[in-house]
Design a protein with these regions (language model features):
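Nucleic-acid endonuclease domains
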Residues: 1-79, 83-211
Length: 211
């Protein structure tokens, strides 16, 4: 057994890799992905998809996702981005549409390179992106249609100042109390940039600060 138990070097896969048994091909990685990841409306996969959408918009989707990292996304500009997602519709039967709530709890950080956790509980990002799959017709729900998403962007310092120990926040409270910037997918780069620089864009910039 190798004495090296450090982190694996994860390389990005293409989906065409073979699944083998005794030298015989029994499937492909893409088959597994289709089997495991096709339900994009459940909480787990929707959350991962939301991270990917934000990373893609910010030019940070190169490489692979790190599970349980201290922040969800690190951009080429060195911005640290935390991504949260919510939706009115779920893949299971619902008596009513879900109430929209996002997790904002400070947390201890975990380092994948060392396998150790920090005892300090805090929010480590520069900015939060709250991703709302706002579509409300179950028959036409499609998480891959980015017109069905709305994004709210907020500097982390505002959460630290206004909600220092709060663990979750309703959409109504987020909008009314904290005034995040609201944008569509195309506007994410400018909106995140504005928030990381601690600025609100001037009127007519194409961004929509909520009142």
């Amino acid at each position: 057994m190798s004495a090296d138990l450090g982190p694996l070097a994860i390389t990005r896969r293409s989906s065409s890799e073979l699944i083998r048994a005794k030298g015989e091909t029994v499937g492909r990685l893409g088959d597994f992905w289709s089997w495991a990841c096709s339900d994009l409306a459940n909480n787990t996969m929707r959350g991962v998809l939301a991270e990917y959408l934000v990373a893609m918009a910010l030019g940070a989707a190169i490489g692979t996702r790190t599970e349980w990292d201290t922040v969800d996304i690190r951009t080429p500009e060195k911005w640290r981005v935390e991504v949260k997602s919510a939706a009115y519709l779920q893949s299971w039967a619902q008596p009513q549409m879900s109430k929209i709530e996002f997790g904002i709890a400070p947390a201890s950080g975990w380092d994948a390179q060392t396998g150790t956790a920090s005892v300090e509980v805090m929010r480590r990002s520069d900015v939060y992106v709250f991703c709302l799959l706002h579509h409300q017709d179950k028959q036409t729900l499609d998480p891959l249609n980015l017109d069905q998403w709305t994004f709210y962007v907020l500097p982390t310092r505002i959460l630290d100042e206004r909600c220092p120990t709060q663990r979750s926040i309703r959409l109504s409270s987020l909008v009314e109390r904290l005034s995040p910037l609201k944008t569509d997918f195309a506007g994410l780069p400018k909106t995140v940039s504005a928030c990381t620089e601690g600025m609100r864009q001037p009127e007519g910039s194409g961004l929509n600060p909520l009142q």
